């Protein structure tokens, strides 16, 4: 997946805001840690250097082992045949309800838990990058 991105690419979703090699690292980490992962995509549209797609990822969240079905809308901008800008949209509260269970149901809508999740995800990605020199910035 990482090879689809331009070296100067930017990625944003409700959890991450990344650039360059860190996008590669995120996909590597998520796919490596995902249990029972499957992906279905639909409504792919391409016009010039812009594309969009809807997709649904199904997996067991590695921290809680709870099943997650996450519908995502993606938009892409391409440069030199590679993704230079990628934006994913999904309902973070719905994701937290599935992935975290009761705590996600009760607190997933709060800025407190959303920010805690973002911090946890950033720390996990930083640890992954530290263990994989190929993703460290030059």
Placement of each model-derived feature along the sequence:
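Short, solvent-exposed coil/turn segments at beta-strand boundaries
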Residues: 1, 48-50, 76-83
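A solvent-exposed, acidic/Ser-Thr-rich amphipathic alpha-helical stretch
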Residues: 2-51
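Generic short beta-strand segments
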Residues: 8, 54-60
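Short, surface-exposed beta-strand-loop junctions and turns on beta-sheet-rich folds
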Residues: 18, 59-61, 92
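Short, surface-exposed coil-to-beta transition loops
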Residues: 37-39, 54, 67-74
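Terminal "cap-and-tail" regions of soluble proteins that handle hydrophobic small molecules
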Residues: 80-138
